[in-house]
Amino acid sequence: MLVVSIGGSPSTRSRSGVLLERSRQWLQDRGVEVVSFQVRDFPAEDLLHARFDSPQVQHFQQLVAQADGLVVATPVYKASFAGALKTLLDLLPERALEHKIVLPIATGGSIAHMLAVDYALKPVLSALKAQETLQGIFADDSQIAYGEGAKPAQLAPALEERLHDSLETFHVALARRPRPVAPGVLNERLISARWSI
């Protein structure tokens, strides 16, 4: 299984990034290959000028096309997800998430931002034809405490449990996801099949 994780925060230190990293570790511990992207890893000019021919953008598009699922994490600013994330998602082809499972993760200053996932992020994922967008996770800033120095960030126990449950649901959804059959393979199967009437 291949999962692409996308971090929508332009900041190197972000709570959504903490949850994305925990998700990556959890999935890798279960044998899932995870390739991580952060919006800040892309040249700003590529995002702002929609450079579809950029080597980094093309590499991103190829890995998304190969992925079984995506984990998309974003901070919530002014009742919506990060604008930098939107510019990156806009560089994907129209049906880029077809046959893919998506787990959205969002963080915000208060619980009042929780609906941003449903009313802002999920419609964009739907427009990209995600096969299934899971309920996802929202965490307010008080549930994630940055670690001092090299110490890891601490999650509130309730958040830790919700993250684990959501990742378990995501993992199960990936496992049961039907795999599209390439036209050439399908033709071979039809030719070699035994038919009876």
UniProtKB/Swiss-Prot annotation:
Keyword presence, Translocase: no
Disulfide-bond pairs as recorded: none
A Gene Ontology BP annotation from the UniProt entry: alkanesulfonate catabolic process
Keyword annotations from UniProtKB, A to Z: Flavoprotein, FMN, NADP, Oxidoreductase
One Pfam family this sequence matches: FMN_red
Gene3D superfamilies to which the protein is assigned, alphabetical: 3.40.50.360
Any one GO molecular-function label of the UniProt entry: oxidoreductase activity, acting on NAD(P)H, quinone or similar compound as acceptor
EC numbers for this chain: 1.5.1.38
Catalytic reaction(s) noted: FMNH2 + NADP(+) = FMN + NADPH + 2 H(+)
Protein family per UniProt: Belongs to the SsuE family.
Functional note: Probably forms a two-component reduced flavin mononucleotide-dependent monooxygenase by binding to SsuD. Required for growth on aliphatic sulfonates or methionine but not arylsulfonates.
PANTHER family: FMN REDUCTASE (NADPH) (PTHR43408:SF1)
Name listed for the protein in its UniProt record: FMN reductase (NADPH)
Lineage: Bacteria, Pseudomonadati, Pseudomonadota, Gammaproteobacteria, Pseudomonadales
Gene that encodes it: ssuE
